[in-house]
Amino acid sequence: MKLFECQNCGQLLYFENTKCESCGMRLGYLPAREAVTALKALGDPPGRPQRFRAMAEPRAQYRFCANAEHNVCNWLVRADSPNLFCEACQHNRTIPDLSIAGNRIHWRKIEFAKHRLFYTLLKLRLPHKTKLDDPQDGLAFDFLSADAPHPHGSGTPVMTG
């Protein structure tokens, strides 16, 4: 995995960082630039999604993926995009029940691994269509628990693969 650098102060950054430990700048991952980037808030009014200028790509405006609200994603989406979710989170079909204690922590670990997978898929320019884009061959993630009912009603045990 590539190491990154804060565009504001030069501090070493890691893929999952959301804040620079040196200068305090908010950070986000910009898939199109393959960069963790320092962000400058645009000062949106309350109730609207916060928009940012990415120091790695200052001409465009960005916002965080909707899953950033749960502290499980640091990827950016163009502010004018109709998608609420980033390229990686668009593939989530089922997420854990967040009302169950501990599920948010488990989901975060799974999301970090999934985001590393998508980093690699994008880097290698491999196809990664969603099930909505391609119902037959698209990719979808169902993050299930053996303790919760199966969301598709099949009653089959939870398995990986």
Predicted regions mapped to residue ranges:
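Residues immediately within or flanking Cys/His clusters that coordinate Zn2+
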Residues: 2-3, 17, 59-62, 70, ...
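Short cysteine-rich clusters marking metal-coordination/redox-active sites
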Residues: 6-9, 20-23, 62-65, 86-89
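Cys/His-rich microdomains that often coordinate metals
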Residues: 10-13, 27, 69-72, 77, ...
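Short Cys/His-rich micro-motifs in 6-15 aa windows
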Residues: 24-34, 88-98
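A short Gly-Trp-Pro
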Residues: 27, 32-68, 157-161
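Short linker/helix segments within small regulatory modules
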Residues: 56-59, 76-82
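Fold-level signature of zinc-dependent metallopeptidase catalytic domains
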Residues: 84, 94-95, 99-110
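Auxiliary, metal-adjacent structural segments of Zn-dependent hydrolase domains
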Residues: 109-161
